[in-house]
Each structure stands twice: as structure tokens, then as C-alpha cells.
């Protein structure tokens, strides 16, 4: 779970303009951070299958957001992929 300080930092880092919390870049960055935290959780709790389902939901949600951004603006998509160090 993201703490409010972490969430605020991510929002400020990826926001397009002041007060931006809903742009695809911000949403994808927040989802990526939650996914990374869950991956750390699974390093010590391999048998936590309930949380694994939540992880799969987050990954598919991020995939849909990335597909949308790629369809709308390919340059923003490529920039975000590089900034987040995602494979693509």
C-alpha cells in the first residue's frame, strides 16, 4: 500500500500540469509502484495467492492504461516506458 507521501511524490513527478492526478502517466506510475511493492511482498510470502490475484488485476489495469496512451499519443507512451523502465 502506498503511503500518502509516496503517492504525492509520484504524482508530482509524473504530472503534466499542476493538480494533475488523473492523466494516464500518473495513473500508470502509481500502478507501477503498487505492482513493485507487491512483487517485494511475494519474495517473502510466496504462497499468498489472494494477493497474487490482486497483482494480476493491477497488471492488467496498467496494461489497459498503457494501451490507451499508446493509441492516443505514441511519444508520451515511449517517454513513460523509458522513465518507468518498463519492458517494451
Curated annotation (Swiss-Prot):
This is Small ribosomal subunit protein uS15. The gene is rpsO. GO terms for molecular function: rRNA binding; structural constituent of ribosome. InterPro entries: Ribosomal_uS15, Ribosomal_uS15_bac-type, uS15_NS1_RNA-bd_sf. Pfam families: Ribosomal_S15. Keywords: Ribonucleoprotein, Ribosomal protein, RNA-binding, rRNA-binding. PANTHER family: RIBOSOMAL PROTEIN S15, BACTERIAL AND ORGANELLAR, SMALL RIBOSOMAL SUBUNIT PROTEIN US15M. Part of the 30S ribosomal subunit. Forms a bridge to the 50S subunit in the 70S ribosome, contacting the 23S rRNA. SUPFAM superfamilies: S15/NS1 RNA-binding domain. Belongs to the universal ribosomal protein uS15 family. The lineage of its organism: Bacteria, Pseudomonadati, Myxococcota, Polyangia, Polyangiales. GO terms for cellular component: cytosolic small ribosomal subunit. CDD domains: Ribosomal_S15p_S13e (cd00353). One of its GO terms (biological process) is translation. One of the primary rRNA binding proteins, it binds directly to 16S rRNA where it helps nucleate assembly of the platform of the 30S subunit by binding and bridging several RNA helices of the 16S rRNA. Forms an intersubunit bridge (bridge B4) with the 23S rRNA of the 50S subunit in the ribosome. SMART domains: Ribosomal_S15 (SM01387).
